[in-house]
Design a protein with these regions (language model features):
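Conserved ABC ATPase "signature" region
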Residues: 13-31, 84
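Conserved ABC ATPase signature
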Residues: 36-40, 44
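Hydrophobic anchor residue at the start of the ABC signature
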Residues: 50-51
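Conserved catalytic motifs of ABC-family nucleotide-binding domains
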Residues: 57
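Catalytic Walker B motif of ABC-type/P-loop ATPase nucleotide-binding domains
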Residues: 61-65
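ABC ATPase "signature
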Residues: 121-122, 130
Length: 153
C-alpha cells in the first residue's frame, strides 16, 4: 500500500500516518495490516483495496467489481460501509459492477454500457422510466426478477 507513496518521496512518518488514517476510515483491525491476502477475509481484502486506492488522495477513485466473490451477507454489510466511506472521503468514485441493485444503492448516477459503448447515463429512475433502447429495458428487467418456486422446480 505504501509503495507508491515511498516512490513519490513521502517520509516514513507521513506514510504511517496516512495508513492509520485510512485504516480507521475503513474500520480495519490493525492486526490485519501485516497479513498476506490469503490470510484475510473477503471483506478485509476489500477494505485494504479501498485503502490502496485512497492512499495518494486521488480526485477520482476507480473500483472495479469491489464486491466480487463475496457472499450475500458480507456483500450487503460492505455495501453499507462503502456508502459511508464514499461520503466521508468526499471523492468522485467510479464503481464498475454488473449488479444493478448495487449501483442503485451506491451511485448518484448510473452509466450502462453494452458491447463497449455507452447506452444510457442517468439516475436509476431515468433508466427505468425512459430507457434509451431495448437493451436498457432488458438489463433492468433481468435484474428486477428472481425465479419463483414454480420456475425452479
Amino acid at each position: 500500500m505504501s509503495l507508491i507513496a515511498t516512490l513519490r518521496g513521502w517520509r516514513a512518518q507521513k506514510i504511517a500516518e496516512r495508513v492509520e488514517e485510512l485504516r480507521k476510515l475503513v474500520d480495519l483491525d490493525p492486526a490485519v495490516l501485516g497479513s498476506f491476502p490469503f490470510e484475510m477475509s473477503g471483506g478485509q481484502q476489500q477494505r485494504v483495496a479501498i485503502m490502496r486506492a485512497a492512499m495518494m488522495d486521488p480526485a477520482v477513485m476507480l473500483l472495479d467489481e469491489p464486491m466480487a466473490a463475496l457472499d450475500p451477507l458480507i456483500r450487503r454489510s460492505l455495501q453499507r460501509e462503502l456508502k459511508s466511506i464514499f461520503q466521508r472521503l468526499g471523492k468522485t468514485v467510479l464503481l464498475v459492477t454488473h449488479d444493478l441493485g448495487e449501483a442503485v444503492y451506491l451511485a448518484d448516477a448510473i452509466t450502462l454500457l453494452h458491447e463497449g459503448r455507452v447506452v444510457q447515463s442517468g439516475t436509476y429512475r431515468d433508466l427505468l422510466l425512459h430507457p434509451a433502447d431495448p437493451f436498457v429495458t432488458q438489463f433492468i428487467n433481468a435484474q428486477r426478477t428472481l425465479p419463483d418456486a414454480a420456475e425452479i422446480a
